[in-house]
Swiss-Prot record:
This is Peflin. Residues 114-149, 155-183, 181-216, 217-253, 254-283 form the EF-hand domain. Pfam families: EF-hand_6, EF-hand_7. The keyword Ubl conjugation applies. Keywords: Calcium, Cytoplasm, Cytoplasmic vesicle, Endoplasmic reticulum, Isopeptide bond, Membrane, Metal-binding, Repeat, Ubl conjugation. There is a cross-link at K137 (Glycyl lysine isopeptide (Lys-Gly) (interchain with G-Cter in ubiquitin)). InterPro entries: EF-hand-dom_pair, EF_Hand_1_Ca_BS, EF_hand_dom, Peflin/Sorcin_CaBP. Residues 1-111 are annotated as: Disordered. Residues 204-284 are annotated as: Required for interaction with PDCD6.
Amino acid sequence: MASYPYRQGCPGAAGQAPGAPPGSYYPGPPNSGGQYGSGLPPGGGYGGPAPGGPYGPPAGGGPYGHPNPGMFPSGTPGGPYGGAAPGGPYGQPPPSSYGAQQPGLYGQGGAPPNVDPEAYSWFQSVDSDHSGYISMKELKQALVNCNWSSFNDETCLMMINMFDKTKSGRIDVYGFSALWKFIQQWKNLFQQYDRDRSGSISYTELQQALSQMGYNLSPQFTQLLVSRYCPRSANPAMQLDRFIQVCTQLQVLTEAFREKDTAVQGNIRLSFEDFVTMTASRML
């Protein structure tokens, strides 16, 4: 048997995927109020929130001063987040997509019940083959980082798997609406921790982000994340897609650990097979 020390901090409470209520198809965003709540630990053996919490705006006013954080391909090049293109990044989709709502899968009415109207507009825009579903290819084409690079394949596949309730490799309008909210929440968190407003997360900013989300992880671990998920350069920094991927996987692994750590001690003992089973069953 092996012992795996975990230290103290881990966000959320026991449950399924981030923010998902029991039996829910869709994991929630970091501030969804579900099983993970705000992404902060509730107290006890896993530590408490950092002073001020991680969700308030950074000092000096609003997060960026620009309405476009660089998620969907809109805006104009310039600063790290650009300016909003006509129609905004989250308002109506570009005229080249669907234009006004047309007869189709959902008729001429508004968004289906329980679907965010803005998410529905973007669903119509992203669904380029008019199939009524969003594939990984379509999702990847629709999502860009602040440096105008496309989201990486790993993050896109992870999000498809999270919100694909039919396990068909694509998401319907309801899954897309949940995904849209999920990305919005992580984007807002990304903006807050990008203290220098560079459009990316540096090593120092990532260390601060993990700490304020409730994780008590060593600088060496943060450096490992930077080495693994940031492009090699003199000053490596993490884009939005990798930030979403890293934080979501940390949440999922935390849940797996918490299920075993019934005494909330920060340490567990388990066999190698139990360890790999626990990890493999939580892979997204």
